[in-house]
Amino acid sequence: MEIYADQKYTKLVSHLYYQNSHEIVHSSKIYQLALTNPDILSQYINYPDESNESHESHDCHESQNSTHYKFRLMEIYHKMIIIDNNMDLLDLLFEIMSDDFRCDDCVILDLAIRHQRTDVFNKYIILGFDLNRLINSSTILDEIILWYHQIKKYDTGIELCDYLIDNGASISIHNYCTIINAFDTLNDKYVSFFLNKISLNDLGNLLFWYLRNYYNVNIDIVETILSNGIDINNFHEYSYMLIGKFNVPIMNLFIRYGLIIHDDVIDDACRYGNHLLVDYLMEIGHKPSKQIITNVIENHNVNIIKLFVKYNIDLSDIKPPTSPEIIQLVKSLESNGLSVDYVYGYILDKFNLSGKLCI
């Protein structure tokens, strides 16, 4: 690339370099283009810090470390694309290292999202840009959903999402967080749009992913997915791994939609130390296997042991392995007058105080 050689211009570039000494500015495409064209330097690089767009972004996206420098790019591109509509200059920018995705591209795509610029998206699509890659640590679809939910313009958000999906953005595991965010808005238009875009198989995968990865599961989102006809007893090949971890409201919901509770569900709940679910399952008639009862007692899971007592679980055949030395010691203590009740109580109390309540 040939750099414009005028001495006065070179001095301006040098001044800009040291005045804005930061990697994001120096490595930006607009800076590289400015080195070849003095008009770009005067019109865009030195554009004053007045763009309202930068203040919008300050509230929504930026981290403290790089805020000023990305604002600078936002101001420059806001003037170029939104105010001047200089698409010819944007074409020149795309010619600079077009295979290298940079901070500039994040800023430009962010502007395209906020100002409904499908013409800008189309330029990226022509260049072969992957619409499923991350910008600002999330997907383009996610940015659209969150932005248009924030400003309550759902129809516009849906139009943009539809355009991008038609041009290669996929609803896959890479965008599951996007769909959950859409469902989490509880906006009927967003929810209906994405439900119509997802196959039953992908919907089952989405449900599995959500239940496995989210700590605070929104039961309304779960019901939204369940109500769309997925096979609740076979929605994912590993769904059985999750059921024993359900909380009681989620289990109630699944049962209401036809979940068949197999014998191993209560065993899994015991294994995970999920005593609230174990209590619920015992109350409706399920009982753990002898092997799990033995494991619970061996590991002194006091909360589950209490439930065995509460529901009169027969423990007469349960004999956890104990070394002959320990058996002899207990018998000796008993023969010396120490109550066996005291021994059991002491051991359980010690495990309780040390927090060993789970298998």
UniProtKB/Swiss-Prot annotation:
ANK repeats: 72-103, 105-133, 142-173, 203-234, 236-260, 261-287, 288-317
Gene3D superfamilies linked to this entry: Ankyrin repeat-containing domain
Domain of life: Viruses
InterPro entries, A to Z: Ankyrin_rpt-contain_sf
Alphabetically ordered keywords of this record: ANK repeat, Repeat
Protein name: Putative ankyrin repeat protein R190
Natural source organism: Acanthamoeba polyphaga mimivirus
